[in-house]
UniProtKB/Swiss-Prot annotation:
Protein name: Large ribosomal subunit protein bL36m
NCBIfam families: rpmJ_bact
Species: Rattus norvegicus
GO cellular component, as recorded: mitochondrial large ribosomal subunit
PANTHER family to which the protein is assigned, alphabetical: 39S RIBOSOMAL PROTEIN L36, MITOCHONDRIAL (PTHR46909), LARGE RIBOSOMAL SUBUNIT PROTEIN BL36M (PTHR46909:SF1)
Regions crossing the membrane: none
Gene that encodes it: Mrpl36
Length: 97
C-alpha cells in the first residue's frame, strides 16, 4: 500500500515537472538552452554567480581613520563627526565611524 502511494506521488511530481513552462515575462531573460528543461533554466537564473558589491560614489565611505586623498579634499565637522569632502573627485568622500 505504501509502495503504491510513493509510486503515485513520484509519478505526479514527474508529470508536473514536464508541464512546467517558462513564464512569458522572463522568456527573453532566460534564453533558450537546447538540452536544458525549463525548470533547470529558472533554477540556473536564480542561482547566479557571486554578486559584486560596488562602492557607490554618491555615498560616504565609513572609516575609522579618515585622511585627505588629494589636495582638493577638505575636512568638515558636522553632527559630531568628521567628514572629508572633495570638489574634484566625489569618490574621496569619507565619514568617520
Amino acid at each position: 500500500m505504501a509502495a503504491l502511494f510513493v509510486r503515485s506521488v513520484v509519478a505526479s511530481v514527474v508529470d508536473l515537472s514536464r508541464l512546467a513552462v517558462k513564464p512569458r515575462a522572463f522568456s527573453i531573460l532566460l534564453g533558450t538552452l537546447p538540452s536544458a528543461k525549463p525548470c533547470a533554466e529558472v533554477r540556473s537564473l536564480l542561482c547566479g554567480g557571486p554578486v559584486l558589491s560596488l562602492q557607490p560614489s554618491l555615498g560616504f565611505k565609513t572609516k575609522g581613520v579618515i585622511k585627505k586623498r588629494c589636495r582638493d579634499c577638505y575636512m568638515v565637522k558636522r553632527r559630531g563627526r568628521w567628514f572629508v569632502l572633495c570638489k574634484t573627485n566625489p569618490k574621496h568622500k569619507q565619514r568617520q565611524m
